[in-house]
Every structure is written in C-alpha cells, then in structure tokens.
Amino acid sequence: VVVAAALVAVLGFTAITTSWRAVRAARLAASGVRAQFAADEGLALQLNAWPAESLTALPLGTTYTSRLTTQIGDPIAVRLTRTHPLIAWVSAEVALKSSGSVAVVQRQVTRVVSLDPPPLPIIGALTAIGAVHATDLTAMTGHDHADAGDACGPLRDTRTVPAIAAAMVSAPAHAERGEPPFLRLSDTTRVRAAFETAWPAIVARSAVRGAEGNAGGLAQMPGWHALVLSGPQVAVQSSARWRGLLAVSGDLVVGGSLDVEGVLVVRGRLDTRKASLRVRGAVVIASHGNPDVALGDHTRIQFDRCAVLMAMATVALPRSSPFFLWVHPAL
C-alpha cells in the first residue's frame, strides 16, 4: 500500500510538473511573440517620426537614443547610428517580464535604413541653369579630396565632377578644374524639371526664414542643418557661415562674405562680384527671368562629396523600399 501510494504521488507530481512547464513555456512563447511585435512596432514608430534634425546634428558613428511606448504600453528602447551620411542602423529592443514567472523575455530587431534626399540635380561643383560669368581670379574645381578634418573621415571615397555644368560659361580656362572642366547642359529643360521636383521637398523639410533685404544672423551651428531664406532679393552684407543645406528662394547678392560647407541652392540669380563666396560642397542655381550667374574675384567653389551628402541628409527621409532585417530571438 505504501509503495502504491508513493507511485501515485510520484505520478501526480510528474503530471503537475509537466503541466506547469507546459504553461510556463506557453507564457514565455506568448511573451516572446509580444516582445517581437513590440520591437517591430517600435521600428515603425521611429521611421514614421524620423528625427532628421537630431540625427544630422551628430557626427558619423554617434548613436542617437530614444524611448518609445507601444499602443498597449510596452516600453521600447530605440538606437540610431549613422555609419554613412545617407545610411543609418536602427535597433529596437524590448524586454518583457513573463506573466507568472521571474524570467525576462528580450527581443531586438535591427534594420539598415537608406535615407532618400530630394533629387536635386548636382552635376558639377557649380550647376547652373543659365549662363555663368567668372573673372580671372574666380576658382572652381570638381576635384574631390579627403583630409584629416573631413566629416566622413580621411579614408572616404572621392569623386571628380565637372567644375561647371551650365548652358553657357564665360570664364578663363584656368578658373575651372575638373573632368571635364566644363560640361555644357544641352537640355536644361530636364535639369530644371528635376530641380522643380526637388524644391518643394527641400522647403517642406527645412526651416524657413523670411529674409527680404539683408540676411542677418546667419551663423554656423554645431552639426548640419537645412535653412531656406525667402525673399525677392536676399543680401549678405556682413560675414556669414553655414554648414548643411542653405537654400535661397529669390536672388542672392553677396556683398560681404559667405562661407558654406555643404550645398548652396539659389532659386534665382547669384551675384558675388563685390564679395567673397567660399563653398566646400556644391552650388546649384536655377534662376527665373535673367538666368545669368555673376561670380567675382573672391569666389572659391571646391566640390566635396562628403559635404554634399551630409547636407542632403538634412532633408532626407527613410526610403520606402524594403529593408534588410535581422532578428535576434534571445540576447
């Protein structure tokens, strides 16, 4: 009798233990699925509210962190790391405590996100839909080179472009250096169409400031930023600096000095005959009416692929094409 009772007790204990383990496994599996869905939701929330300004203010390789909450209240830790001006790694991590257990279920989902900037037609160091007039002392080069202070690092890829891409150029031969030094735009209609397609997106994704007359208070800030100056004629009469994308909706007349690291876009005329203009990156001019671009003795334009990409990243959004996906079921 004692042996029989012991066997019954052992069998009962085994059945209870098996049932408990099955319930625990089911709860852990349910928590894992919930954590996986939460991580996917966190990525979707982050991509929907892309932190362009916060991300582009950081150097390459720096991680931007934030915390989000799903619709049912699960906390999510999100990390964004830029490894390239137009590429970011986005990771969402979720840790949930399983119901009725001390175990914690963790899930991490990582995606490589490509950023898609507006299709601004950057063909040369200076791209102009119109005629470009330069002096003997104007210097423009499409030869890209990386140095120790480069935002993308001294070992980045380089690219050589034409010094000037325009419908017509009136400039001394030594003012242009590139391959070729001058590229004639035989079909300006297509270039203008590309510009007009990109312009609304640039305005929508940039800070806009009314600047009719003198564009005062233009100072370089940490990081890279996008700004649109709006006015029939914008004048720079003092010393001004900008890093990122600087766009002008109207004519730009430089009477003082303007230094731009990134991309300078003018939807109007550009006149630098009485001033100093230095650009490391690229310049795009799409004028209406009088299409002439007048450059002075102190105009220096140096093509820089990294500066162009960093500037365009300030107005870029995550691409809607499929992403590469890695799932880590357990950390």
Please place each PLM-identified region on the residue numbering:
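Low-complexity, Gly/Pro-rich coil/beta segments used as flexible assembly/activation regions
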Residues: V33, F37, E41-S91, P180, ...
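Aliphatic-rich helix starts adjacent to a transmembrane/signal segment
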Residues: V3-A38
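Short alpha-helical scaffold segments that flank and stabilize functional sites
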Residues: T18, A22, A38-L45, A49, ...
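Generic hydrophobic alpha-helical segments
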Residues: A9, A22, Q46-A49, E53, ...
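N-terminal segment of the canonical double-stranded RNA-binding domain
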Residues: V1-V3, M310-F324
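Short, ordered "entry" segments at domain starts
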Residues: T81-V208, A219-A311, F323-L331
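Active-site-proximal helix/loop capping residues that flank conserved catalytic or ligand/cofactor
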Residues: F13, Q36-F37, A44, G124, ...
